[in-house]
Amino acid sequence: MTETFQHYTVMLKETVDGLNIKPDGIYVDCTLGGAGHSEYLLSQLNTNGHLYAFDQDQKAIDHAKVRLAPYIEKGMVTFIKANFRELEAKIKEHVPQVDGILYDLGVSSPQLDEAERGFSYHQDAPLDMRMDQSAPLSAYDVVNEYSYNELVKIFFRYGEEKFSKQIAREIERVRKIHPIQTTGELVEIIKDVIPAPARRKGGHPAKRIFQAIRIAVNDELGAEEASLEQAIRLLKINGRISVITFHSLEDRIVKSMFKEYSTVQDLPPGLPVVPEEFQPELKLINRKPILPSEEELSENNRSRSAKLRIAEKIRVKEE
């Protein structure tokens, strides 16, 4: 199990240390993955501290049970197999509030590297891309059943792909002849459509389409937005939230939500001080995103697009 679940932990110390860990605090890792962040966070806690770890992927949880065994024996870890859009409901089954929450929104390396999961455009595999293997919607369904207009919308909105219409049209043409069943078939369709000059720049030609389909299959942006709203509510005063994103769509959601919650509301004119009820809920710990160090980039190429944003809860909003 451990051999098949190797995952480089992106910005490990920056993300966890940014939470300002209290040894007896209660923390949530919303994206357990390879358990690197969880392991380092647990090493900062005493036996009165506790970590709740979310993942939709049973393989990730099974691996983490081995990696985190010393902390499990001390009763310091609770695993929750669920989408982090259920954050608030699941956490409130255990505790009313927490001291810190972290998100690493990248697909974990094992999911990318296991061919049968269908996340990678480098390996031929069935079109799947489900984070939760029991979920009903797969990449096969999107590619073979979504209308031309739906595909264009997904490719443009989630992949920011300028050849969205041409690719959707070619998918529509091919699937009338036979179902598109594998990642390799989809890659060839994309390569056939994108002009040679465009293929030679901007990374792999299938990158943006695969990202778009993965986001659609897992409703990643909807889940991210819903979960962040819940996370802010769950934090105690002085509790912190760390979020690592890997593409502009994810980062835009974090940036705009943190800005919304850290901005003073419209005030009546002429007030000498900002009244308590107008104070923002969050304080930004870093105005600009934290980026991986040169050392990390040399060790892990997948870190290159990562951005870390951290905020602290400074006020509870009155209902």
From Swiss-Prot:
Positions of S-adenosyl-L-methionine binding:
35-37, 55, 84, 104, 111
Question: Cross-referenced InterPro entries, in alphabetical order?
Answer: RsmH, SAM-dep_MeTrfase_MraW_recog, SAM-dependent_MTases_sf
A GO BP annotation? rRNA base methylation
- Write down the superkingdom of origin: Bacteria
Coarse class of the protein's main subcellular location: cytoplasm
Subcellular location per the Swiss-Prot or TrEMBL entry: Cytoplasm
Q: Which UniProt keywords apply?
A: Cytoplasm, Methyltransferase, rRNA processing, S-adenosyl-L-methionine, Transferase
- Annotated signal peptide: none
Tell me if Methyltransferase is a UniProt keyword of this record: yes
In short, the EC number is 2.1.1.199
Query: Any one cellular component term from GO for this entry?
Result: cytoplasm
Q: What class of enzyme is it?
A: transferase
Recorded catalytic activity of this chain's protein: cytidine(1402) in 16S rRNA + S-adenosyl-L-methionine = N(4)-methylcytidine(1402) in 16S rRNA + S-adenosyl-L-homocysteine + H(+)
Report whether S-adenosyl-L-methionine shows up as a keyword of the record: yes
A molecular function (GO) term: rRNA (cytosine-N4-)-methyltransferase activity
Q: Which Pfam families match?
A: Methyltransf_5 (PF01795)
Q: What is this protein for, i.e. what is its function? A: Specifically methylates the N4 position of cytidine in position 1402 (C1402) of 16S rRNA.
Under NCBIfam families, the record lists: 16S rRNA (cytosine(1402)-N(4))-methyltransferase RsmH (TIGR00006)
Similarity comment: Belongs to the methyltransferase superfamily. RsmH family.
Q: What is this protein called?
A: Ribosomal RNA small subunit methyltransferase H
